[in-house]
Regions:
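Extended, solvent-exposed polar beta/coil surface segments
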Residues: 1-225, 229-230
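Long, compositionally biased intrinsically disordered regions
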Residues: 23-27, 62, 66-80, 524, ...
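Generic extreme N-terminal start-of-chain segments
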Residues: 35-106, 271, 285-286, 290-368, ...
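Glycine-rich catalytic cores of cysteine/serine-nucleophile enzymes that process amide/ester linkages
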Residues: 82, 105, 117-183, 190-197, ...
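Active-site nucleophile-His-acid catalytic modules used for acyl/amide transfer and hydrolysis
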Residues: 95, 485-604
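Long, charge-dense tracts
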Residues: 135-394, 409, 429-430
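A short, compositionally biased domain-edge/stem linker segment
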Residues: 392-404
Length: 692
């Protein structure tokens, strides 16, 4: 009888019939299971919180004791490998020594008379951020065009089309059949629901300008998600240009969703000092490509102090940024010049995080798994202001330990997770639960334009709910999503990006002209998810609840990718014949590894062996409340769906589980951990996301 209670729900879930037709008979069983699981989770989280609290108290008393014995951080600041624990002291005179160690030699070397104030003399040190770069402008309802095109104010263009700069063109989708399939699949009518209007009143930003429109395409939702036309993007190549000379109308035709970026120009600098107290002007020195040092032209720029958000937390601060431990390696600064021809920074990116130089390397599967489980987020508050890069390799051999596994042109999958904001001015965390956020992305190894060294170029695929900050679901470059001074998370949250290098996922397959691309398929699935999140599947609202989140829907994209690739192979006899004919080929071995990876990932995504009904049918997204008929039982059904995929409920748990699967399949993992990097805000501290 007991076995029946567990088997019956499985049979029902696997059937194609409606979930609620059976929920009455299974109500009592479901309640017991859900309440039991919920109780277990909360008890486990409470114990974790209690242990963490005790550990912090012990650390506090240890620091107090060390302080009384005369120890100081100044003596250990000389070692690059020592992480300094910032003390939240009341005496502001000791802040620099407490946080960043002794004063930088760079700041003492500047002489005001060598500062260059000639904009033309430094113009060559700034480079455009993208070849095709512009601002999206939403047309009025009366101006709308077929295929959901939008206006595109051109900020930068290739040399051949420099005449386009400053003009407004039509940006539209290719009429290619596959592209139009994507466009039509995610186009929606938008009509705000009561839940959406309630969310608006609480401060979240929803696509108000699109409310009441019909058949809204993905370009329109990208342009119209915010209340104003402030989304700036780069266009992926190829871009087809149609120049109607007779009507002075320009059209730009694309086949991929634009990528969000910020700023017009980019430079690489080291910050020397603040020009004047209580001023946002800083003296910086540009990178010299010849000497490979920061001994180029000195210039005055502005790094504005942004206003706090509604919770009183500023996303970034310029306070003591010149004393940051990352300053010696430099910052990529993104922005544009103001009316006084002074460069105003809109986003920053520490050069160190993009470099292919690990701070630590762990060899062997056992040590690599142990690092992921216990060391990755260890003692997060003490790492404030720091960056750490770690290479995990499943191979035990250390012979080639100094050789980077990355080469120019390599592509890796990014698994992104961030934590919480603690400290006196931090956000609340009931029972110490910090959910955080999860996303996928793509990292490519490119040649740096300023230094000629190899570096990572990271692009996130943000399945992001509507929020009070105006962060838009979609593809975003690192500098836009993380480095934006006003909206980015670099300065106030701890972040972990795990970049996976596994050829069976990142390389295409060519079966005598039949091309299969797992990475392209994953990108397409995520593009569809992100577009649907912008519309809320027609409700105008994608909201996070305890049982539903971005991590569930990002995981859904992986599941859909696995099933689609598998189905294509099973349905194509030519591919199967190729695999049978070439059993020893390297491509066959890679493909077998891909299948094994898919099976392992399925165990993570659906640990109970039961496919969620919404995943099987690819219907409603977890983070979207469509306000269909609601009932007590539909709420229970949602909780059961979450329980079925319980390993993807929390971002950190999902990141760890997927990373471990990839390691076991032979992948190299490159971990980038940042902890409230940039200037110093004494009222906040980084808090690790909750995991099990």
């Amino acid at each position: 009888m007991a076995a029946y209670f567990f088997i019956a729900p499985t049979i029902i879930l696997l059937s194609g019939q409606s979930f609620e037709q059976f929920i009455l008979t299974l109500g009592l069983i479901a309640l017991v299971v859900i309440f039991g699981l919920t109780a277990f989770i909360f008890i486990r989280l409470f114990m974790n919180w209690l242990q963490d609290k005790s550990a912090r108290n012990r650390d506090f008393y240890k620091r107090q004791f060390k302080g009384k014995t005369g120890n100081s951080t100044a003596s250990i600041a000389k070692s690059k490998n020592v992480f300094l624990e910032p003390l939240f002291v009341e005496n502001k005179d000791n802040l620099t020594a407490s946080i960043f160690g002794e004063k930088s030699d760079i700041a003492e070397a500047i002489e005001p008379e060598i500062i260059c104030e000639d904009t033309a003399a430094v113009a060559h040190l700034y480079k455009p951020i993208a070849l095709w770069h512009g601002r999206l402008i939403l047309p009025s309802n009366e101006q709308r065009q077929p295929y959901g095109s939008v206006f595109f104010e051109v900020i930068n263009a290739p040399k051949k089309y420099q005449s386009f700069i400053g003009k407004t063109a039509f940006l539209q989708w290719s009429t290619n059949r596959h592209i139009q399939f994507f466009v039509h699949a995610v186009s929606q009518d938008i009509n705000f629901t009561k839940q959406t209007k309630k969310s608006q009143k609480s401060g979240n930003i929803h696509p108000d300008r699109l409310n009441g429109w019909r058949n809204i395409g993905p370009l329109e939702t990208l342009a119209g998600t915010r209340l104003e036309d402030s989304v700036t993007v780069m266009l992926r190549r190829p871009v087809i240009v149609v120049n109607h000379s007779s009507s002075d109308r320009q059209e730009l035709i694309i086949d991929r969703e634009p990528v969000q970026i910020i700023g017009r120009l980019c430079a690489l600098v080291s910050i020397l000092q603040r020009k004047e107290p209580n001023n946002d002007k800083f003296i910086v020195r540009h990178f010299n490509k010849t000497s490979q040092q920061f001994d180029g032209i000195a210039e005055i720029i502005r790094i504005p102090q942004v206003q706090p958000d509604k919770n009183g937390i500023a996303r970034s601060t310029n306070h003591l940024i010149e004393q940051s431990p990352l300053n010696a390696d430099g910052w990529y600064i993104y922005g544009e010049r103001d009316e006084d021809n002074i460069f105003v920074v809109q986003a920053i990116e520490p050069r160190r995080i993009a470099q292919l130089i690990p701070d630590e390397t762990h060899f062997g599967l056992k040590k690599s798994l142990a690092y992921l489980s216990s060391e990755n987020w260890q003692n997060t508050p003490a790492q404030k202001g720091q960056v750490k890069r770690v290479l995990l390799t499943p191979n035990d051999s250390t012979e080639n330990g100094l050789i980077s596994p990355w080469q120019e042109g390599d592509i890796g999958i990014v698994i992104h997770c961030f934590g919480g904001i603690g400290g006196k001015g931090g956000e609340s965390a009931p029972l110490g639960i910090v959910t955080g956020h999860f996303a996928f992305g793509v990292a490519k190894v490119v040649r740096d334009r300023f230094t000629s060294e190899q570096r990572f170029d990271i692009e996130y695929k943000q399945v992001y709910a509507h929020n009070p900050d105006g962060i838009v679901a979609g593809s975003s470059k690192w500098q836009s999503y993380m480095g934006d001074l006003q909206r980015g998370w670099l300065g106030d949250r701890p972040v972990c990006d795990i970049i996976c290098k596994l050829d069976c996922v990142c390389c295409d397959y060519d079966f005598d002209g039949i091309i299969l691309s797992p990475l392209s398929e994953l990108n397409q699935q995520l593009d569809m998810m992100m577009a649907r999140y912008r519309t809320g599947d027609g409700t105008g609202a994608s909201l996070v609840t305890p049982a539903t989140s971005c991590v569930q829907d990002s995981s859904h994209a992986i599941y859909a990718t696995i099933k689609k690739i598998t189905a294509e192979v099973e349905a194509n006899p030519e591919i199967q014949d190729w695999l049978k004919t070439n059993p020893a080929a390297a491509q066959t071995q890679r493909f077998q590894q891909l299948l094994a990876l898919g099976e392992s990932l399925e165990k993570v995504l659906i640990p109970l062996g039961v496919v969620r009904p919404d995943w099987r049918k690819n219907s409603r997204l977890a983070g979207i409340d469509s306000e269909l008929k609601k009932s007590f039982f539909s709420g229970i059904a949602n909780l059961i769906k979450a329980a079925i995929s319980y390993r993807t409920m929390l971002p950190r748990r999902t990141q760890d589980e997927i990373a471990k699967v990839l390691l076991k399949q032979g992948a190299f993992l490159w971990i980038i951990r940042t902890n409230q990097v940039g200037g110093f805000d004494p009222n906040i501290e980084p808090i690790a996301p909750t995991g099990f």
